[in-house]
Amino acid sequence: MEQSKSASDKLAERKARLLDLHKKRQEARTDNHQEVVAEDARKKLPKNWEARKRQAEWLLADDKAREDAQAAGKDYERLKLLEVSAIDAERIEKKKKRKDNPDLGFSTYEAQTARQYSRLVKGMPARDMEKYEKQKAELGEAFYGGPHTTLHALTKDTPAAINKMVNDLDQQIERRKKYSRRRIYNDDADVDFINERNSKFNKKLDRFYGEHTAEIKQNLERGTAI
């Protein structure tokens, strides 16, 4: 009797363990399916989604802090500065200047043209509708132009516009001088090249093989080479 009871207990225990394993397998299958669905959803999002999400959360928190400061009658910008150290404030200011004026020198002609266009657009004077209507009335049909329109004798540049153009050209010349990468030639250096391209090639050879060819070069210069 005790032996049969022990056998039934073992069977019940095995069934309970089997049921527990079955539940765990179902839970693992459900978790895996949910993870696959979530991963597929993440793949369908834009590449910069996480960065945009963090930025949106920061903007919401910043707007809320600004509203709380205004409700308390405090200057929010001053409160932000109090939380920033002098070193961090200087770093932020430098980063802001680089962002406002990201001129790191010449890169490509397309980038240079686009930058010059943006700079000229920003430097345009404010819209003057009175001047616009006056010029429109003076020029008549020639105001909108056409295939045979000539404005040479109809318009005249103001001294202020001419001075502005001259100043702009002077600034362009100064910037080009600043970012010029042309090396100044040293008159005391040995002449072992025929042009600038050959000079660069010789310097590259000397950088890689100079220590191995120094003795051969000296013998050639002395005329004692075999």
Curated annotation (Swiss-Prot):
It comes from the Eukaryota. The keyword Ion transport does not apply. Residues 22-41 are annotated as: Disordered. It holds the Pfam family SYF2. GO terms for biological process: mRNA splicing, via spliceosome. It is found in: Nucleus. Its main location: nucleus. Keywords: Coiled coil, mRNA processing, mRNA splicing, Nucleus, Spliceosome. GO terms for cellular component: nucleus; Prp19 complex; U2-type catalytic step 1 spliceosome; U2-type catalytic step 2 spliceosome; U2-type post-mRNA release spliceosomal complex; U2-type prespliceosome. InterPro entries: mRNA_splic_SYF2. Residues 9-29 form a coiled coil. The keyword Nucleus applies. Belongs to the SYF2 family. Involved in pre-mRNA splicing as component of the spliceosome. Identified in the spliceosome C complex. This is Pre-mRNA-splicing factor Syf2. It comes from Drosophila pseudoobscura pseudoobscura. The lineage of its organism: Eukaryota, Metazoa, Ecdysozoa, Arthropoda, Hexapoda.
